[in-house]
Amino acid sequence: MIYIGIDPGKKGAMAVIDSETIDLPVVIKFSPEAYRSILLHARGMKCTLGKEVKCCLEHVGAMPGQGVTSMFHFGENFGYIRGLLEAFEIPYELVRPQKWKKEFSITGGKNSSIEVCKRLFPGVDLRRSERCRKDDDGLAESLLMAEYARRRL
């Protein structure tokens, strides 16, 4: 079984957990090409190896203070991701942040997600690049959504 978690935001990410290697999840930052290749690979594993694939896509709406242009780009990313999931016939569920965060008892901000993620997946590097010093909440949250899919979907 393959579980995918996707944070569709500007600094979003995608995480993939294979039930055979739960301790070695794959986490990638947002890039249309990377998302396409990962989902195509997941579809290939589904078709050739008969692995079942489940995806948790974060369902978020407009946030107060966001401009029209940023909301348009967010909607564009969200639509692109949904289009890929549909085209590659990967079943997905739209899950609101409150729902998946409740699963992990996350009540605080972005740092809470990073802390929980590090506790569940201590070996995963949550930095966006080698040069970054701080862990990235988008990477952490996508991995937590993949874990949510593993537990609940």
Predicted regions and their residues:
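Phosphate- and other anionic-substrate recognition elements at nucleic-acid/protein interfaces
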Residues: M1-L153
